[in-house]
A protein has these predicted regions:
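Conserved, mostly hydrophobic/aromatic
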Residues: 6, 77, 87, 114, ...
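Carbohydrate-binding surface patches
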Residues: 258, 273-314
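Active-site-proximal helices and loops of the catalytic beta/alpha 8
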Residues: 11, 16-24, 72-75, 83-172, ...
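Substrate-binding/active-site clefts of carbohydrate-active enzymes
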Residues: 1-80, 101, 105-107, 124
C-alpha cells in the first residue's frame, strides 16, 4: 500500500486565518508576503482569487514565503511516512515555483512521487521545468471517452500517438474518471465504461481508478455552486447496499487490474495501431525492450466491446 496526500498549494479559503492576518498586518509582513493581494486596489487591499472563485485566495508564488510553506508541509508528512503528493491545480502555478520546492524536498525524500494536476499544454515541458515526476494525462482521458461516445476511434489513435511521445520523457498518470469530471458510466454507458477501462489497463502509464467507477456510479458534473455533488457521492454503509448492476463492472475491474499486474511492463509500453476504422481499432502495446506484447481490439459497431490477446494470439480477456 502506498499513500499520496492531496496538496492544495495554489490557494486557501477566504476565511483562512493567514489571510486575515495578512490584511491586518500589511504587505511588509510575512503573512502579507505569503498571499497574492492587490495592495493598491482603489477600494483597499483585495486578495487575488483562484480562477474567479471569490472564496479562494491565491498564494503569492513569486515570494519566498510560499516556497518555504510548501516545503515545510510536504516534508512534514513525508517524514511521517506518506509516499508522495498530488499537487492540486499544479497547472495554475509556474513550473519555476515547483522547481524551487522540489529541489529542497528531493534530497530529504528522494523516493517521493510527485504528481501534478495539469489539464493541457506541454506536459513534457512542465515535468522537465518543474522537476515533478508525472502529470495527469487529460488528453488521453478525453480521447478514450469521446472516441467511444462519438464512434470515432481515429481520435483514440491520435491520442495514443501523442501518448507515446510523452513516454519519451515521463510516465503519465492515466485515468478515465476523477473527482472533477462527469462519471465515465454517464458519458458512455456501462458497456462503454468497461471498454474504456480495457483501454486504460492496456496502454502505458500509471493508471488511477476513481472510487465508485468500479461500481458503475453515475453523475453529471455541472458548472454551478454544488455542481460536483453528483460525482462525489457518499459510499453506502455496507457493500450489500450497492446497486446490483455494479457487480459485472466490479468483476471487469478485478479481471483487468489482474491482467495489468501480470504484465507490469505495460507501465512504459509503446502502442502502435495495426488496424483502424471509425468503429474498430486494433492496437499493439509492446514492452519497451520488445520482448513481449498485447494486442487489443476495440469494436463499437454494436455494443462497445474489447478483446485482449497475448503475443501468441491467445485470448486473455473478452468483454
Amino acid at each position: 500500500l502506498r499513500i499520496l496526500l492531496d496538496g492544495v498549494f495554489s490557494h486557501v479559503g477566504e476565511g483562512h486565518p493567514g489571510v486575515k492576518q495578512a490584511l491586518a498586518e500589511g504587505p511588509g509582513s510575512p503573512a502579507g508576503r505569503l498571499f497574492d493581494i492587490d495592495w493598491q486596489h482603489p477600494g483597499g487591499p483585495r486578495p487575488r482569487v483562484f480562477e474567479g472563485h471569490s472564496s479562494l485566495v491565491r498564494l503569492n508564488h513569486s515570494g519566498q514565503e510560499a516556497v518555504d510553506l510548501v516545503v515545510r508541509v510536504m516534508n512534514h508528512w513525508l517524514d511521517r511516512g506518506i509516499d508522495g503528493w498530488r499537487l492540486d491545480a499544479a497547472y495554475s502555478v509556474r513550473p519555476e515555483f515547483w522547481s524551487k520546492v522540489v529541489e529542497r524536498v528531493r534530497p530529504r525524500h528522494p523516493n517521493a512521487w510527485l504528481l501534478g494536476e495539469v489539464l493541457h499544454g506541454d506536459y513534457s515541458a512542465f515535468v522537465a521545468e518543474s522537476g515533478i515526476d508525472s502529470v495527469t494525462q487529460y488528453e488521453l482521458w478525453k480521447a478514450i471517452w469521446s472516441s467511444i461516445n462519438d464512434r470515432n476511434l481515429f481520435e483514440l489513435d491520435h491520442a495514443l500517438s501523442r501518448h507515446n511521445q510523452f513516454l519519451d520523457s515521463f510516465i503519465p498518470n492515466t485515468f478515465i474518471g476523477n473527482h472533477d469530471v462527469t462519471r465515465i458510466a454517464s458519458r458512455v454507458g456501462t458497456d462503454g465504461a468497461v471498454t474504456a477501462l480495457a483501454v486504460l489497463m492496456t496502454v502505458a502509464g500509471i493508471p488511477s481508478i476513481y472510487y465508485g467507477d468500479e461500481q458503475a456510479f453515475v453523475g453529471i458534473k455541472e458548472d454551478r455552486l454544488g455542481g460536483d455533488d453528483a460525482i462525489r457521492p457518499a459510499l453506502p454503509d455496507s457493500p450489500a447496499e450497492l446497486a446490483p448492476w455494479g457487480r459485472p463492472v466490479l468483476r471487469a475491474h478485478q479481471e483487468l487490474i489482474g491482467l495489468r499486474r501480470r504484465h507490469p511492463w505495460l507501465v512504459n509500453a509503446r502502442t502502435e495501431t495495426l488496424h483502424l476504422e471509425n468503429q474498430r481499432i486494433v492496437y499493439r502495446s509492446s514492452a519497451a525492450d520488445g520482448s513481449t506484447s498485447l494486442d487489443v481490439e476495440i469494436d463499437l459497431s454494436c455494443s462497445p466491446n474489447a478483446t485482449i490477446r497475448d503475443a501468441t494470439g491467445r485470448e486473455l480477456w473478452h468483454q
